[in-house]
Amino acid sequence: MLNNKWMNLIFLLLTLLVDVHLSNSLNQFFNEEFRLVSHIFLFVLVYQARYNQSFSLYWLYAIVGFLGDVYYFRMIGLTSLLFPSMLYVLRKFPKFQETNPFQLFLVVLLVNFFFEIALYVLAYTYQLTTYPIVDFIAFSLAPSLLYNSFISLLLLLGLSKRNNW
């Protein structure tokens, strides 16, 4: 995707920034109990895990995770742990490289699901939230998965036309 490490870092930071502000903007339209979270950044992670085999990608995602923790959560350790570990897990599946667009869409949905669940478990473990799991699933996880599946489908349709899948 982007072979230059500095351009890749800037692209990842811009994607993370767009995600944060898009999430905040979308939450203005809903009731305060609904929390919609945009994860275009995770789509980029899956796409780069598939096409960029460089080891420096781990360091880039650790740096972006650290900056995302400071900017979004104001606590270090949540996304700086999850981003490189998700990249590692994605690279451990050799069949992941041979997927068609529908399978890639399902991988993006699974990554979104596991990221949200892992983030909730870590936040609950560190006592950053007292939000019950049932409310988390109903008011945050389900709307976020629906929104991110729609966005991922649009992005995959655009990329599949570009890559002639």
Q: What do the PLM-derived regions correspond to, one by one?
A:
Residues 1-165:
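Terminal, non-globular segments
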